[in-house]
A protein has these predicted regions:
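Short, glycine/charged-enriched hinge/interface segments at domain edges or termini
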Residues: 1-152, 293, 309
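A broad, low-specificity signal for short, low-complexity segments enriched in glycine/proline
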Residues: 4, 41, 71-75, 113, ...
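Flexible glycine/proline-rich
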Residues: 13, 34, 73, 194-330
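Generic structural signal for well-ordered, non-membrane alpha-helical segments
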Residues: 40, 69, 87, 132-136, ...
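Predominant activation on well-ordered alpha-helical scaffold segments within soluble catalytic domains
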Residues: 44-45, 77-80, 91-95, 137-140, ...
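Helix-rich terminal scaffold detector
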Residues: 103-228, 232-238
């Protein structure tokens, strides 16, 4: 073995006072700075644990077990850019550079209103003709996942004056309003009618996309109102295509935007597309599996496990396994 004189003991947070000369060593703990003059670190398991004199039993290479200064990032290096969503990792990166404050965009405040006298709150007993209000919770939670703040959640009866009151309240407290239901042509489909009566400006009132083609966008007292379909999957599609895009624009965050990607089908799809159609799917490595059956726009259960919306372009029909398609990750 090689014998070295121990001239200093260094714990994390303590700066070295000695310069290590030939035949000398310092006992050092993980996280402590390496003293000048040293050129390698020996694991204590390879020594006799000596205090004044230490015996080294295994040869070392220069700079073994070093954590070089600047290996994570260098002075002046750009670590985070404008438009990124601050998650746990990015907050940790900022903290590791000594940043205690970061300029961020305030959370977008969103009001969610589901319309329909048939809607019942989960946990209550259904009366004849009622269904549970899944869209209120689905849309609200998705907005939170995208970084929004849900400032109001209301289920509204199919009564014009009640709906007007809820919309006025929402416009006063929210930057963005999302409604579901009441956008088709039924006698009790009141959302468009009520918004028009309130003087809301119509941006568009239909989209050439299925499901959810009656989807509309209004501006009420300068607050955008996305009026989505009452069918849960149709509402999900336009939550991703339109509302998500609006939230991404609010934050200036390209990561949140619903960008199209290209992949390959692992299963067949036999329906034709008169307009662009979006269907649910599960993507892995650019390969997309479609759920077996249960594709109607009112069905939500087959979305369990799905992580993308697959775009079937207008005019395409009878897609076969292996064909290329566009998709949006959820």
């Amino acid at each position: 073995p090689v014998c070295l004189k121990v001239v200093e003991k260094l714990c994390a947070g303590k700066y070295p006072k000695q310069v290590i000369g030939s035949g000398e060593a310092a006992r050092i703990m993980t996280g402590a700075p390496i003293p000048n003059g040293a050129d390698t670190v020996v694991k204590q398991e390879d020594t006799d644990y000596g205090e004044g004199i230490v015996q080294i039993y295994r040869s070392q290479n220069p700079y073994d077990h070093y954590c070089p200064q600047g290996e994570d990032f260098l002075a002046g290096e750009k670590l985070l850019t404008k438009g990124l969503r601050m998650d746990a990792i990015r907050i940790g990166i900022a903290a590791s550079a000594g940043c205690d404050r970061i300029r961020v965009v305030k959370k977008v405040r969103v009001a969610v209103l589901t319309t329909g006298s048939e809607l019942a709150k989960p946990g209550t007993k259904l009366r004849p003709g009622q269904i549970y209000d899944s869209s209120l919770y689905l849309i609200s939670e998705r907005i939170r996942e995208l970084g929004g703040e849900v400032v109001r959640m209301n289920s509204v009866l199919d009564e014009p004056e009640i709906l007007k009151g809820r919309l006025r309240e929402a416009a006063r407290c929210a930057d963005l309003i999302v409604t579901t239901g009441g956008v088709s042509v039924g006698e009790k489909d009141l959302t468009r009618q009520v918004l028009s009566q309130m003087g809301a400006d119509k941006v568009f009132d239909r989209v050439f996309v299925k499901p959810g083609s009656p989807t509309a966008l209004f501006r009420l007292e300068e607050t955008p109102v996305f009026a989505l379909s009452g069918n849960p999957f149709a509402a999900t599609v336009h939550m991703e295509l339109l509302v998500r895009a609006a939230i991404a624009r609010w934050y200036g965050c390209d990561e949140l935007f619903p960008h199209e990607k290209r992949g390959f089908l692992l299963s067949n799809f036999g329906k034709s597309a008169v307009s662009d159609r979006y269907i649910r799917g599960t993507e892995s490595g650019g390969r997309i599996l479609l759920p077996n059956g249960k594709e109607r726009s009112g069905i939500l259960s087959s979305m369990n496990g799905c992580n993308c919306l697959v775009k079937i372009e207008q005019g395409r029909a009878n897609l076969r396994e292996g064909e290329r398609v566009c998709y949006i990750k959820i």
